[in-house]
Amino acid sequence: MQALADQIARAETRIFKAVFPGTTNHYDTLFGGATLHMMDEVAFITATRFSRLKMVTVSSDRVDFTHPIPGGTLVELIGNVVRVGTTSLQVRVELYVEQMYSEERLLAVTGSFTFVALDDARRPTPIRPGAR
């Protein structure tokens, strides 16, 4: 079990981005579609770093927007593997919003993304062959 825990820890992914005008909506907050795009990207990187296999998103589950993300702020996206199946895994992504010129930081969005590993024929393949 420790090997799995170590593999999960090594796969954690953290990315920072600035919220620029091209990603905001008419309320000058981060557009929901842009948020989902960033979250899926971080989840994909996390899944790939964990498995080192070809991974595809098969679902995004329960994405909760709990705090607005104003333009001119910073966001940190953190992806962690939370479940590993035979051919699929689940990644939880947390998005924190930070003020640029203060220490204020809030958890703004959370979501869960499921990925499946594919072989060269694009069929599901085991993520951890031989692992128990």
For every predicted segment, state its role.
Residues 2-15, 69-71, 82-132:
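HotDog/MaoC-like acyl-thioester-processing domains
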